[in-house]
Amino acid sequence: HNMLPASTHYAVLPDPDGKRVGSGGATLNVLRYVHENAGSFENQRILVIHSGGDSKRVPQYSACGKLFSPVPRVLPNGKRSTLFDEFMISMSGVAARMNAGMLVCSGDVLLLFNPLQIDAPASGAAAISFKEDVETGKNHGVFQMDEQGNVGEFLHKQTVETLTSRGAVNAQGKVDIDTGAVLFSADLLADLYTLVDTPAKFAVFVNDRARLSFYGDFLYPLASRSTLEQFYREKPDGSFTEELH
C-alpha cells in the first residue's frame, strides 16, 4: 500500500519453533537471518526492533503487539500513527550516520533525538543514553563511564547511594540512562554470528532454556570493568545453563 519504502528489506522474525528464546536469542536469530540472506554484514545497515512480551501493562494491544500501539498523532496521510510509524520516522536518519552495522532498539521505548548527534563506531559497540536526574535513574539501567570515556559498568536499578559511590552521578546530579538502543559495528556482528554459524551452535544458544538476554548477556560483558565472576552472579532470564560456560 506504498506505506513502506520498496528499497528497504523488511522482515518479521518470530522466536524459532514458537518458543521464547529471550531478547539475546532473538538477536542471534536476526544475525542468522541476515547472514543467510545477505551473505555477510558488510555494507548492511540494519534496524532491529524487539517487540516481544505479554503486554501485561497494556493488554488491550496484546493482539496487535505493543509495537503497533497507537500514539496521539495523525500522519500526513491522515492515518493514526503507531509506535512503529514513529520508529520508522525517528530512526530513518540514523542510517546515514553509520557505514555498516546494526541498531537494536526496544519496541516499547520511543526515542526522539537528532541523528546528527550520533557517531556510530567503526568497530565495537555504542549505546545511546541521555542525562536524567539520579532519582529517575535509580529505576533504570545506568551507564558508568571509565577514564577513557567508555562504559565502565552497566548498573541496573541501583540505589542512589550505589550510583553515587560507583561514580555514575555527575556534579549536576545527573546519570546516563540506558535507552535500550545500541549500535553494533559490522565486525562485531560477524564475531557474534560465529556463536550460531552452525545448526548445532544455534541450538545451544537459541532456545527456551537458556533464554539469552540481549542486555544481561550481550551488553554487560562489553563494559570495560565487567568481570567473569560478576557476570556469573547476574540473574539469568531463563535457566542457569552449565553448557554455555
Describe each PLM feature range.
Residues 1-245:
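Unchanged
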